[in-house]
């Protein structure tokens, strides 16, 4: 029951994280215009992985897709690739994990095969979550670098009053898509870890010792009392031996060395 619960929870978390990764990849607000100390408030700009948008104060929004691939920054293309790879791996992991559920029986599939499928889906989810987190973090680092470079250019020394002249430049800060991507990547990563933990519950324990068959009556050993009879030298020893209940073993089987009751 614990294994099935762990599988289901891991699958649901990974499914939710995958949906968040898809939503974050398609969102336009990866970077939004920083309105702090900005005299121009009639126009609000924001950019995504696939297009840039301009929203006017009247509510009209115009988006323009990126019509080039080679002309885009290399970091932006890397973020695109990471997010797409994470989504593809997440979809494959979802399909594998559905068939790996312990509560679903498909033909003669045993638990060892389900354990391998569960481990595979868990690894796929972990890689998918890592790709999403790395992609979002790379884009965030690019935003931070550009932000401080723009800030330095705004207050560059160009003479004038106090030797400082402030120029108006558009600075971008974190958008909502970054936070969605971070949360989605974390959920996918946690779901993958739970699937890997559930794999241990499906793996047969090979460290157990092999079972040894024995007679149940051997636990309570009782003796049959009997006297001793003198034997002749021509026949076998006719004395009564202590016999164990539940088996054909006699006292000679248990003790082979001579005793004081042996006669010639």
Curated annotation (Swiss-Prot):
Residues 1-6, 102-122, 198-264 are cytoplasmic. Residues 198-264 are annotated as: Required for role in regulation of RANKL-induced osteoclast differentiation. It is a multi-pass membrane protein. One of its GO terms (molecular function) is identical protein binding. Expressed in the lung (at protein level). The keyword Transcription regulation does not apply. The modification Phosphoserine is found at residue 217. The chain crosses the membrane at residues 7-27, 81-101, 123-143, 177-197. Disruption phenotype: Parenchymal expansion phenotype and overall lung enlargement evident from 18 days post-conception (dpc), as a result of increased lung cellularity, airspace enlargement and increase in the number of AT2 cells in the lung alveolar compartments. Increase in AT2 cells in S and G2/M phase of the cell cycle with no change in low levels of apoptosis in the lungs. Increase in bronchoalveolar lavage fluid leakage as a result of alveolar epithelial cell injury at P3 and four weeks of age, resulting in an increase in AT2 cells in the lungs by four weeks of age. GO terms for biological process: calcium-independent cell-cell adhesion via plasma membrane cell-adhesion molecules; cellular response to estrogen stimulus; digestive tract development; epithelial cell proliferation; epithelial fluid transport; lung alveolus development; negative regulation of bone resorption; negative regulation of osteoclast development. Its main location: other. It is found in: Cell junction, Tight junction; Cell membrane. GO terms for cellular component: bicellular tight junction; cell-cell junction; lateral plasma membrane; plasma membrane; tight junction. Induction: Induced by 17-beta-estradiol in bone marrow stromal cells, osteoblasts and osteoclasts. Interacts with TJP2/ZO-2. Interacts with TJP1/ZO-1. Interacts with YAP1 (phosphorylated); the interaction sequesters YAP1 away from the nucleus and thereby restricts transcription of YAP1 target genes. Involved in alveolar fluid homeostasis via regulation of alveolar epithelial tight junction composition and therefore ion transport and solute permeability, potentially via downstream regulation of the actin cytoskeleton organization and beta-2-adrenergic signaling. Required for lung alveolarization and maintenance of the paracellular alveolar epithelial barrier. Acts to maintain epithelial progenitor cell proliferation and organ size, via regulation of YAP1 localization away from the nucleus and thereby restriction of YAP1 target gene transcription. Belongs to the claudin family. This is Claudin-18. It comes from Mus musculus. The lineage of its organism: Eukaryota, Metazoa, Chordata, Craniata, Vertebrata.
